[in-house]
A protein has these predicted regions:
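Short, well-structured N-terminal submotif of metal-dependent ribonuclease cores
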Residues: 1-38, 51-58, 133-149
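A generic structural signal for short hydrophobic patches within well-formed alpha-helices
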Residues: 10-11, 43, 80, 116, ...
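Structured helix-beta-strand junction loops
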Residues: 32-33, 69, 86, 119
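Conserved beta-strand segments of alpha/beta enzyme cores
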Residues: 35, 71-73, 122
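Short beta-strand scaffold positions
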Residues: 37-38, 74, 110
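Acidic catalytic patch
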Residues: 62-87
């Protein structure tokens, strides 16, 4: 399964934030069970934030490690224009959704599911995605909430 990881998911790991255990469990499955993708524009932001917190050398090492298990979703001019038309409050999230469409992702994994309600690709938290995989009978709707069916 193809998963686009929102930047906040990668930052969970980089900065060992509270959601990091579930994120690490999900990432451990990437390469074996799932294919992880990152939006092209996320890489620069991740590098900048890691460098700011640590060092340029650590930022490059982190990005190199990241690119060892995640692919990069590249978008085009038309994708950015399309993202402008999606009913999403944050344009950066719309660009994440455009990257998810471009790489053929089935889900966007993020900490802010609510901001992806207008996305053409459903969004889930790492915890919700792992719970869904543990319970295959769970059906996920477009908004990332389990349905009653």
């Amino acid at each position: 399964m193809r998963l686009l990881l929102d930047i906040n998911i990668v930052l969970d790991v980089a900065f060992q934030r509270p959601g990091e255990p579930a994120t690490s469990a999900l990432i451990a499955r990437c390469g074996r069970e799932h294919q992880a993708w990152l939006a092209w524009h996320s890489i620069a932001t991740i590098a900048y934030l890691v460098e700011r917190q640590h060092s340029a050398q650590m930022a490059r090492a982190f990005i190199r490690g990241l690119l060892g298990w995640a692919d990069v979703a590249v978008t085009q001019h038309a994708d950015a224009l399309q993202a402008l038309d999606w009913p999403m409050p944050d344009f950066e999230d719309a660009l994440q959704a455009a990257a998810a469409v471009a790489c053929g992702a089935q889900f966007i994994i993020t900490r802010n599911v609510r901001d992806f309600s207008g996305s053409p690709i459903p969004a889930l938290t790492p915890e919700a995605f792992l719970a869904q995989k543990a319970s295959p009978s769970a059906v996920v709707t477009q908004r990332g909430k389990p349905s009653a069916t």
